Regions:
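Rossmann-like NAD(P) dinucleotide-binding subdomain of oxidoreductase/dehydrogenase enzymes
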Residues: 90, 99-237
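Short beta-strand-to-turn element immediately C-terminal to the catalytic PLP-Schiff-base lysine
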Residues: 233-237, 265-268, 324, 345-348, ...
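Flexible, glycine/charged-enriched surface loops at secondary-structure junctions
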Residues: 26-27, 95, 171-177, 255-260, ...
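ALDH superfamily catalytic-core signature
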Residues: 126-129, 133-141, 159, 163, ...
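C-terminal core of ALDH-fold dehydrogenases
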Residues: 31, 327, 332-417
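Short, well-ordered beta-strand elements within core beta-sheets of diverse protein domains
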Residues: 17-23, 264-266, 316-325, 340-345
């Protein structure tokens, strides 16, 4: 099959659909989202059967536990996908909403309103739930979407996208608005990245390798959803029990996600008291700790951390630990090794808390809370399209507004520019 020809045909169909979607009434979009949710729940067995085949093949390939967790679907996760679509339907429609208006001295009335981006390409890896989340958000924001998931989840993604596209079409969404690329050949990604004039933006979601490849090679504008080398710094004044609770949640509640903690920093003044408690709590959750020399002097059972560990997103039950001199050293470490995702400080010192939030360069900066909250649902955006770690167009969890652009509407009464 001619991949380039097929991809261009998909892009042309999406472009046609996007023009109709841009002016579709909110009620039609919401009805389609609810129909898509119903279809997922009613045909859950079809999705689970496809997912079981994907999982069987992934296990045979020896893929690691964290990858299998991202790939795995069950009835609960399918219900979450359906609920995400219903929550998206319940969110306010950003399209045509005004966020600025003025009347100029010459009488011109100027308004700025939200409009869809157009056609969005999503390139992602193991998570089949992204198929539903992305399709729902793009549709609600008036965008057509072309989805290209990872080869390991191909059966799951085909099942989900087929159900969603059929349900949406029956509910009044233009044909071609939701499309899935069923080629597993990497050539499809390369072709997709060069569909300038058809795709308005590409959003990659996945590991560092995928994101680097897309950002360095795409001819289409890219919104970078970064990897998550997230830190928690335990300050000298921290409530240590709170710090342990937050650290365990940030690392062990779901270690494969991008908002999980990868490195814990602790102030030298409390390290001797705090680290044995941390070691016990993490060991109980089967987390392997890799420490700096100062940390291992306190807890010799820690593995030795290398320079590479400080910049590694493990996606697994592994945690790097470093003892730092003070807040200044903690901030310097974070700004050197982080990926601009989510960072946290545990402290009772408000001056230190405010300084940490000012000086740490990240999309989300927490005081006395787990980094695991960096998520569209938790931020009240509904499902998210991804978590942007770049600073242009969008940053942090990207909900509906991040999938729109702006248009200026100007009303005059015959004015001409002198």
């Amino acid at each position: 099959m001619d991949i380039q020809k097929t991809m261009r045909e998909k892009a042309e169909a999406a472009k046609r659909a996007s023009r109709a979607l841009a002016i579709l009434p909110t009620g039609v979009k919401n009805e389609a989202l609810r129909a898509m949710a119903d279809a997922l729940e009613k045909r859950a067995e079809l999705v689970l059967e496809a997912n079981a085949q994907d999982l069987e093949e992934a296990r045979a390939k020896g893929l690691k536990r964290s990858y299998l967790d991202r790939l795995m679907l069950n009835e609960g996760r399918i219900r979450q996908m359906a609920e995400g679509l219903r929550q998206t339907a319940a969110l306010p429609d950003p399209i045509c909403q005004g966020d600025y208006s003025t009347i100029r001295p010459n009488g011109l009335e100027i308004r700025r309103v939200r409009v869809p981006l157009g056609v969005i390409g999503i390139i992602y890896e193991a998570r089949p739930n992204v198929t539903a989340d992305a399709a729902g958000l793009c549709l609600k924001a008036g965008n057509a979407v072309i989805l290209r998931g990872g080869s390991e989840a191909i059966r799951s993604n085909i099942a989900i996208s087929s159900l969603l596209a059929k349900a949406a079409y029956k509910a009044g969404i233009p044909e071609g608005a939701i499309q899935f690329v069923d080629f597993t050949d990497r050539e499809a990604v390369d072709v997709m990245m060069h569909l300038r004039g058809y795709l308005d933006v590409i959003i990659p979601r996945g590991g560092a390798g995928l994101i680097k490849h897309v950002t360095e090679n795409a001819a289409v504008p890219v919104i970078e959803t970064g990897t998550g080398v997230c830190h928690t710094y335990v300050d000298a004044s921290a409530d240590q029990e709170m710090a342990i609770s937050i650290a365990v949640n940030a690392k062990a509640s779901r270690c494969s996600v991008c908002n999980a903690m990868e490195t814990l920093l602790v102030h030298q003044d409390i390290a001797a008291e705090f680290l044995p408690k941390l070691m016990a709590a993490m060991t109980a959750k089967h987390v392997v700790l890799r420490g700096c020399e100062r940390a291992r002097a306190i807890c010799p059972e820690m593995e030795a951390a290398t320079e590479e560990d400080w910049s590694t997103e493990y996606g697994d039950l592994i945690l790097s630990v470093r003892v730092v001199d003070d807040l200044t050293m903690a901030i310097a470490h974070i700004n050197r090794y982080n990926t601009g995702h989510s960072e946290a400080i545990i402290t009772k010192d408000l001056v230190n808390a405010h300084r940490f939030q000012r000086e740490v360069d990240a999309a989300a900066v927490y005081v006395n809370a787990s980094t695991r909250f960096t998520d569209g649902f938790e931020f009240g955006f509904g499902a998210e399209i991804g978590i942007s770690t770049q600073k242009l167009h969008a940053r942090g969890p990207m909900g509906l507004t991040a999938l729109t652009s702006t248009k200026y509407l100007i009303y005059g009464e015959g004015q001409i520019r002198e």
